[in-house]
C-alpha cells in the first residue's frame, strides 16, 4: 500500500480552503432558502493536509454518495449537486425527509460503511437565518472518534495531537483495506 495512491492530487493553499468554506456556507444558505420545506444534506470528506483530491479519494466519495442515494431511495429527493473542486469534493442533497430523520439515517450510514468515517455528512437547517448543523450528540449519538487513537476526534483536532502524516497513513490503510476487501468480494461473487 502506497500513501501516494490516495494522496496524489493537487496541493492547495490555506487561502483556497478558506475561500471554499465561505462558498460552501453561501451555497448552503442559498439552498436552505430555496427549499425551505426540505432538509439539506451537505457532504464533504475529512482529508487532512494540503491534498484533498485524488482518483482513489473520488472513488471512495462516489461510493458513499451511492450509499446515501440508496439509503434515501424511498424518500423524495428534490435536488442534488456534486462538485469536484481541488479543495475537496462536495455533494448537496435536498430531501422531503425531516431533518432529524435524515441525520439519524446519515449517522447509521456513517457507522455501517467502513469508509463512512472519512465523510462529513452534515444535515443543516436554518436557525436565525443562518445554516446550522444538527449534531449527532443532540440525537443521542456518540461523538466522532479519531482515526488513530479512537478518542474524540474534535479534541484530537483541536490539540493537533496527530501529524498530517500520521492521519494520511491511517486514512491510506483504511482505504486500502476497504478497496481490497471490496475487490475480494467482487472476485468471489464472479467465481461463485
From Swiss-Prot:
Q: Which Pfam families match?
A: CitX
One molecular function GO term is: holo-citrate lyase synthase activity
Keywords, comma-separated and alphabetical: Nucleotidyltransferase, Transferase
Q: What is its EC number?
A: 2.7.7.61
Per the record, the GO terms for biological process are:
prosthetic group biosynthetic process
Q: Which reaction does it catalyse?
A: apo-[citrate lyase ACP] + 2'-(5''-triphospho-alpha-D-ribosyl)-3'-dephospho-CoA = holo-[citrate lyase ACP] + diphosphate
Q: Which HAMAP family match?
A: CitX
Role noted for this protein: Transfers 2-(5''-triphosphoribosyl)-3'-dephosphocoenzyme-A on a serine residue to the apo-acyl carrier protein (gamma chain) of the citrate lyase to yield holo-acyl carrier protein.
The record's similarity note reads: Belongs to the CitX family.
Stated name of the protein: Probable apo-citrate lyase phosphoribosyl-dephospho-CoA transferase
Q: Which organism is it from?
A: Streptococcus pyogenes serotype M1
Q: What is the lineage of its organism?
A: Bacteria, Bacillati, Bacillota, Bacilli, Lactobacillales
Amino acid at each position: 500500500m502506497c500513501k501516494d495512491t490516495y494522496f496524489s492530487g493537487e496541493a492547495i493553499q490555506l487561502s483556497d480552503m478558506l475561500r471554499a468554506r465561505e462558498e460552501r456556507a453561501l451555497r448552503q444558505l442559498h439552498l436552505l432558502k430555496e427549499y425551505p420545506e426540505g432538509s439539506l444534506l451537505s457532504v464533504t470528506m475529512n482529508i487532512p493536509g494540503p491534498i484533498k483530491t485524488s482518483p482513489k479519494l473520488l472513488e471512495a466519495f462516489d461510493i458513499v454518495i451511492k450509499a446515501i442515494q440508496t439509503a434515501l431511495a424511498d424518500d423524495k429527493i428534490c435536488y442534488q449537486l456534486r462538485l469536484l473542486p481541488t479543495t475537496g469534493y462536495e455533494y448537496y442533497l435536498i430531501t422531503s425527509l425531516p431533518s432529524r430523520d435524515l441525520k439519524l439515517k446519515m449517522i447509521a450510514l456513517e457507522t455501517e460503511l467502513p469508509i463512512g468515517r472519512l465523510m462529513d455528512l452534515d444535515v443543516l437547517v436554518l436557525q436565525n437565518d443562518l445554516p446550522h448543523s444538527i449534531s449527532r450528540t443532540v440525537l443521542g449519538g456518540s461523538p466522532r472518534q479519531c482515526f488513530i487513537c479512537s478518542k474524540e476526534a474534535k479534541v484530537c483536532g483541536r490539540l493537533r495531537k496527530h501529524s498530517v502524516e500520521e492521519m494520511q497513513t491511517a486514512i491510506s490503510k483504511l482505504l486500502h483495506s476497504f478497496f481490497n476487501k471490496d475487490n475480494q468480494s467482487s472476485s468471489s461473487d464472479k467465481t461463485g
